[in-house]
Amino acid sequence: ARAAVPVGVLLAVLYIFGSGAASGRTETPDPVHFAQILQEKGYETADVSLTYGRIDRNKLTQAIAGAKGGSRVECYRYADDKTVDLVYNQISYETAPDLEPRARESHETALSGGGKMFTIVADGVYYLVLFRGDTLIYACSPDSLTEINEILAETGYLRR
């Protein structure tokens, strides 16, 4: 069984998300730009397998993954927003399958401008799953989500 601990350091992330509405920016950031940022940060993006590429593959229109050390960041774009919501629910469940519904809610944040974010530390690994519009981000790291949060802010998925 996985041990689940809320990620307290993500309060800064919540601030970033919460203040995003003021920017007026509602479009989903470009996954190609996302890949460029990953490469600039030292992530390998060539021949990196997708952790969740199997889910609703027929509606997956674009996917980009990066790996560096034990950290992974993956960006999935789907044909429609409804599919993204369903995939988000499935991945957040697979990330912490033993979490009771009420406890799961404590790890989830509704994002200003639409979408949701799920964060958890399980078995010493930090996980983040978020969706906004037609795009889903899955990330994990054995160290922290600090660099991943920086990447997400720089690419527009987390808003300053």
Task: Describe each model-derived feature in a short phrase.
Residues 28-29, 81-82, 142-146:
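Soluble non-cytosolic domains of exported or imported proteins
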Residues 10-13, 73, 137, 155:
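Generic low-polarity alpha-helical segments
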Residues 24, 71-78, 135-142:
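Second-shell loop/turn segments in exported
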Residues 12-17, 37, 132-133:
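Short S/T/G/P-rich N-terminal loop/turn motif that feeds into the first structured element of a domain
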Residues 104-160:
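A short, solvent-exposed beta-edge/loop patch
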Residues 32-117:
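Short, solvent-exposed recognition patches
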Residues 1-28:
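Gram-positive cell-envelope targeting signals
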